Amino acid sequence: MEIENSSDLIIDGLYSFLSAGVDEVGRGALFGPVVAAAVILPEDVLDDLASTGVTDSKKLTEKRRCHLASLIRTVAWDCQIGIASVREIDRLNILKASLLAMKRAVLRLKLRPDLVLVDGNQEIRDLFIPQRTVVKGDSKCLAIAAASIVAKVWRDTLIMRLAKKYPVYDLTKNKGYGTKKHKQGIINYGVSPQHRLSFSPCQPSLFEVRS
């Protein structure tokens, strides 16, 4: 399915209003926060971004994501990050924490959008800005795809820094997701303070928490 150039939407062909795309990454990881990005793109860059291959971040190589994230930040009118911590994930559950990260990203925008395009089928609670959910939005909407790329690169950069502190979990390769080597590291060394204790592979009843 082709990406839609929907950073600016048109009502009745007369009124163009400002919209932000928002997406999160890291929902399925065992380690680290969930990270969201909110992006507002000017209409005159949409075709160029689409032609450069902006799409769902999961479909891109790491090198390509880094290049596109830098480009998106350069051309965007506004681009902000929101996170929900590991402890918030454990306290709220991963869905609520993901929506909280998205809300924080939107509220950090210096420009107030008239509409927020939210990836998925869940609206952001208590946002007080009109919003529209877009299922598989990172494959359908350019602004959401851009947000997914920015969020993914930001989170991966964070995990790479944390990997130096916690080398036993193979984080440089798995970026916090539950690979065989990551799970074996948990079995051998216990969990770190950055592991999500509400996720079954990280249950505190089974493993010692390492500082």
From Swiss-Prot:
Classification via Pfam families: RNase_HII
Primary location: cytoplasm
UniProt domain RNase H type-2: residue ranges: 17-211
InterPro entries: RNase_HII (IPR022898), RNase_HII/HIII (IPR001352), RNase_HII/HIII_dom (IPR024567), RNaseH-like_sf (IPR012337), RNaseH_sf (IPR036397)
A GO BP entry: DNA replication, removal of RNA primer
Entry keyword set: Cytoplasm, Endonuclease, Hydrolase, Manganese, Metal-binding, Nuclease
Subcellular location: Cytoplasm
Domain of life: Bacteria
Reaction(s) this enzyme catalyzes, per UniProt: Endonucleolytic cleavage to 5'-phosphomonoester
Top-level enzyme category: hydrolase
NCBIfam families named among the record's database cross-references: PRK00015.1-3 (NF000595), PRK13925.1 (NF010537)
Biological function: Endonuclease that specifically degrades the RNA of RNA-DNA hybrids.
UniProt record similarity statement: Belongs to the RNase HII family.
Name listed for the protein in its UniProt record: Ribonuclease HII
Organism encoding this protein: Trichodesmium erythraeum (strain IMS101)
